Design a protein with these regions (language model features):
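Flexible phosphate-sensing "switch/lid" loops adjacent to ATP/NTP-binding sites
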Residues: 1-325, 349
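Extended Lys/Arg-rich polyanion-binding regions
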Residues: 340
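Catalytic nucleophile serine of serine hydrolases
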Residues: 337
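A conserved active-site-flanking secondary-structure segment within enzyme catalytic domains
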Residues: 344-353
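Ser/Thr/Gly-rich flexible loops in soluble cytosolic domains mediating phosphotransfer, phosphorylation
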Residues: 327-331
């Protein structure tokens, strides 16, 4: 079949729907007879996926690989950052941890070419085998203060010769400003690569937005290629905890058993709880206060990606789980997680669940 240009779904911000849209297009290309493969040069995620050979990539690329009919591979996400604190993260390169870095040193131009060469090489390998490569950007494409060290958005699109589709979230408000700003803050040569704008998460009567479509096209000089409705039944696993604050306010169902997952700051692998969310017998929610926790029949203390030390006891005491007496059961959940002693006091002895 005809060799297609790589296509990148970039975003006006985080959580605008890039991962879902990219997964959808992986399946569409597959159904149309092509052999697509997903690619995200750099991912920041607390939830990772283990490939068949035991290496780590972002979960979104694993879902996209499934949509494309492929087995997940580290070339699909060669650089994975796993936050440990607000300023440090574990760097996973080609599926293997290579150490911890603070934000300032990670974005320092010195040594940046090494990482850039690695992600470019991973793309080249995919591009030589698959058609097309369905690329995903990260966060917003208009973080111009990081332009010179950017590995994943427009510089990656320029390297790949990709056609860029800008995904804008209308549900959060400000779609005109975010779309216009994202386009106009690009360099002229980068702006030329943006071939279309996709409005995502629309609610209501589309006829009311038809004038808005024309306004965006006139302002940005880029066609709006579609408007996607707000879907509630697409279960693509989240990579970070941006949606968990909303889940803290809205329970998953009306089941008889109330399950509270403590909303820790650096919670990881919370996708383990997805099946509970979909169980009609369970009312699962993420709790960030002692009052919310006290309403649960079962408390789950999740794992969190953080430096070794004493983060879990202090964090859980702050949330009110250390001495909670109104709950029937408490369950620690994470591979090799240190379990809290029953009285909630610090205890350096590791206890496996």
């Amino acid at each position: 079949m005809k060799k297609l240009h790589p296509i990148m779904f970039a975003g006006t911000g985080s959580d605008v729907g890039k991962s879902v849209v990219a997964a959808g297009f992986c399946r569409i290309f597959k159904q149309d007879g092509y052999c697509p493969a997903p690619f995200k040069a750099q991912n920041m995620a607390l939830n990772s996926y283990a490939t068949p050979d035991g290496l780590e990539i972002g979960r979104a690329q694993a879902v996209q690989a499934e949509a494309a009919g492929l087995s997940p591979h580290t070339d699909m996400n060669p650089l994975l950052l796993k936050p440990q604190t607000d300023k440090t993260c574990q760097v996973v390169l080609n599926g293997r941890p290579i150490g911890n870095r603070d934000a300032y040193s990670y974005f320092n131009p010195k040594g940046r070419d090494v990482l850039r060469n690695e992600v470019n090489a991973a793309f080249d390998r995919l591009n030589s085998r698959y058609n097309p490569v369905v690329m995903e950007g990260a966060g917003s494409i208009s973080e111009i203060n990081l332009r010179e060290t950017d590995l994943v958005n427009m510089p990656m699109a320029m390297y790949a010769g990709a056609d860029v589709i800008l995904v804008a979230d209308i549900d959060r408000g400000g779609v005109f400003a975010s779309a216009y700003g994202s386009v106009m803050l690009q360099r002229p040569e980068e702006r030329k690569r943006i071939k279309g704008i996709l409005i995502n998460k629309f609610r209501g009567d589309i006829r009311l937005f038809e004038p808005g479509v024309k306004m965006i096209e006139e302002l940005c000089g880029v066609p709006v290629i579609g408007v996607l409705p707000y879907f509630k039944d697409i279960f693509v696993e989240e990579e970070d905890n941006l949606q968990l604050a909303s889940k803290a306010r809205h329970a998953s169902g009306n089941g008889k058993v109330s399950v509270a997952v403590v909303l820790l700051r650096h919670i990881s692998n919370f996708t383990d709880f997805n099946m509970l969310e979909r169980d009609s017998r369970v009312n699962l929610y993420y709790a960030d206060s002692a009052e919310d926790i006290s309403k649960a029949n079962i408390i789950i203390i999740p794992g969190q990606q953080e430096h070794p030390g004493r983060p879990q006891p202090s964090a859980t005491r702050r949330h009110g789980t250390g001495h909670n007496q109104g709950c029937r059961k408490r369950k620690d959940r994470c591979g090799h997680l240190r379990r809290l002693p029953d009285d909630g006091h610090d205890d350096k002895r590791p206890r496996r669940h």
